[in-house]
Amino acid sequence: MAKSQLTTLTRQLIPMTTSMTNILDIIKADYAKFPEAQTYSIYSEDVYFKDPVYNFRGIKQYQKMIGFITFWFKNLKLDLHDISRTDNLIKASWTMSWDAPLPWKPRISVTGWSDLTVDKFAGALENGEGDRELIISHIDYWECSKFDVIKQHFQFLR
């Protein structure tokens, strides 16, 4: 293999590998500081989001949802248990807990996982070169029902 071919091959492989590594690192960092200072630039403009409560499309709606959570859910904590990637699917398992905005401030906890689908977008890097992976779909699943979450608000009624 000629040196120029090897250089071309290296340039093709390194950005892809770096992109894959970087998006996982960014997601880990975002989960650790959630809901503060999220990296919205890793999401496509028309990202699809779904969980047991919300179902919408668009980064602006996603930002509004995070704003709602930030305002109403106090002492919010998102513990990342595991994150892995297979092809274009990133799976993250987590537990989110918060103090509910009620006078008795019950601590609510939901364990679940997120399926994040990524796609490549040409020339999306900050310097205008290369490809960048963006999250095009973010679907959250809970290991409990919505009713189970509601019951946590009123445990004193047992």
Task: Please place each PLM-identified region on the residue numbering.
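C-terminal and inter-domain tail/linker signature
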Residues: 1-158
